[in-house]
Curated annotation (Swiss-Prot):
EC number: 3.6.4.-
Motif interval(s): RadA KNRFG motif: 252-256
Species whose genome carries this gene: Pseudomonas aeruginosa (strain ATCC 15692 / DSM 22644 / CIP 104116 / JCM 14847 / LMG 12228 / 1C / PRS 101 / PAO1)
GO biological process assignments: recombinational repair
Designated name of the protein: DNA repair protein RadA
Domain of life: Bacteria
């Protein structure tokens, strides 16, 4: 038997080194090297590529290109995040905080899929009785889905080859181990090798696999960063565990758009998809309040209306506070400087708090104009109309720049009964949606004047 060799692997990029160091020489990350045991694989161990032991060489012209077949999961929101459905042979990694609903949504999906295609649910964290209890509590169909409690990757793959499921769930990848390594499950080497064997099996058999991944206290997926590079799709489940809304976001997708967002609501019968998220994120209070404005953000392939709230108050600190929830804090500091320079509105003695209602994260620059409108409304203590929509990027010289998909954003506003919209001139349509007055601006000063007409 080959002698085991101790190496140090980086949890971020997967690089290995013979000695420990404070910084990874490959990716530059600090304090990411952990000790692993590397064993020489015996000859003929079957560690070949997806095409087998012999290389398969073709020119691009010789490769037949066909549209990747997809099949629906039964959930419109999940299909949207996946890019239109599940692709045969794809590997999807889904991560999120404990209790956010990762196992729930996958159990619901597989129970519904099992009535149409063979499905296998593999759990290393729960017993079969616990999975059955959860399915009955959610009133899910139980007669078709096969459940297996196992943590050995060799046993899991052998069972999958025998059952030949079209869809399989591994809950979770951190509990799975390979007998070829002596390290404990959840280690860098175990997670990497187990995931590699699952990816290889998925590509060879055409089975679509969902992997559940744990997250660290910083919110990143636990284990080696190479895990995210190996899979086809990476999804993150976001939201407060004690809240009602759950947001499923695609941060990597080889078969669809990234940053695609699916919205779900947690009920006593599990996760229910929200087909009209704009209606959920708009509070529509009885009376207009200062500091509140609605913007149209773009998530993946669809527009979504969200409410931005600002609170500006006199600061008693030497350095006024700048707090954001769902928005970029550095961009807020920049926009406040632009507001002072080109709008003549100083905030150096004011605390500024910003929040996006519903826990949505808005990272695109189309939120600039709405952010500044909310700050102005709170600072002057003057409410903005309920039926006003604002979006646009603001540059350092005070110009208002157009943003992508402006027409679709305006159509979404028109569907929800908005009457006025302040937008960049480049996004002004030739013919506005019925009932919507579009005010096109090119400068920040024009936008501020239009806000309080």
């Amino acid at each position: 038997m080959a002698k085991a060799k101790r190496m140090y692997g980086c949890t971020e990029c997967g690089a290995t080194f013979p000695k420990w160091a404070g910084q990874c020489a490959d990716c530059g990350a600090w304090n990411t090297l952990v000790e692993t045991v590397v064993e020489a694989a015996p000859s003929g161990s079957g560690r070949g590529g997806w095409a087998g032991q012999q290389a398969n060489l073709k020119t691009l012209a010789e490769v037949s290109v066909e549209e990747m077949p997809r099949f629906t999961t039964g959930s419109t929101e999940l299909d949207r995040v996946l890019g239109g459905g599940l692709v045969d042979g794809s590997v999807v990694l889904i991560g999120g905080d404990p209790g956010i609903g990762k196992s729930t949504i996958l159990l619901q999906t597989l129970c519904n899929l099992a009535s149409r295609v063979p499905a296998l649910y593999v759990t290393g964290e729960e017993s079969q009785q616990q999975v059955a209890m959860r399915a009955r509590r959610l009133s899910l169909p139980e007669d078709k889905l096969k459940v297996m409690t196992e943590t050995s990757i060799e046993t899991i793959i052998a069972t999958a080859r025998q059952e030949q499921p079209r869809v399989m769930v591994i809950d979770s990848i951190q509990t799975i181990f390979t007998e070829q390594l002596q390290s404990a499950p959840g280690g860098v080497a175990q997670v990497r090798e187990s995931a590699a064997m699952l990816v290889r099996y998925a590509k060879q058999s055409g089975t679509a696999i969902f992997l559940v991944g744990h997250v660290t206290k910083e919110g990143a997926l636990a284990g080696p960063r190479v895990l995210e590079h190996m899979v086809d799709t990476v999804l993150y489940f976001e939201g407060e565990s004690d809240g009602r809304l759950r947001l499923l976001r695609a941060v990597k997708n080889r078969f669809g758009a990234v940053n695609e967002l699916g919205v779900f609501g947690m009920t006593d019968k599990g996760l229910k998809e929200v087909s009209n998220p704009s209606a959920i994120f708009l509070t529509r209070a009885q009376e207009a309040v200062p500091g509140s404005v609605v913007m149209a953000t773009w998530e993946g392939s669809r527009p979504m209306l969200v409410e931005v709230q600002a609170l500006v108050d006199t600061s008693h600190l030497a350095n006024p506070r700048r707090v954001t929830l769902g928005l970029d804090q550095n961009r807020l500091a920049m926009l406040l400087a632009v507001l002072h320079r080109h709008g003549g509105i100083p905030t150096y003695d004011q605390d500024v708090f910003l929040n996006v209602v519903g826990g949505v994260k808005v990272l695109e620059t189309a939120s600039d104009l709405a952010l500044m409108a909310a700050v102005m409304s709170s600072l002057r203590n003057r409410p903005l109309p309920h039926d006003l929509l604002v979006f646009g990027e603001v540059g350092l010289s005070g110009e208002v720049r157009p943003v992508p998909s402006g027409q679709e954003r305006l159509k979404e506003a028109g569907k929800h009964g908005f009457k006025r919209a302040i937008v960049p001139l480049g996004n002004a349509p030739k013919e506005a949606p019925a009932g919507l007055q579009v005010i096109a601006v090119t400068r920040l000063e024009q936008a501020l004047d239009a806000l309080f007409e």
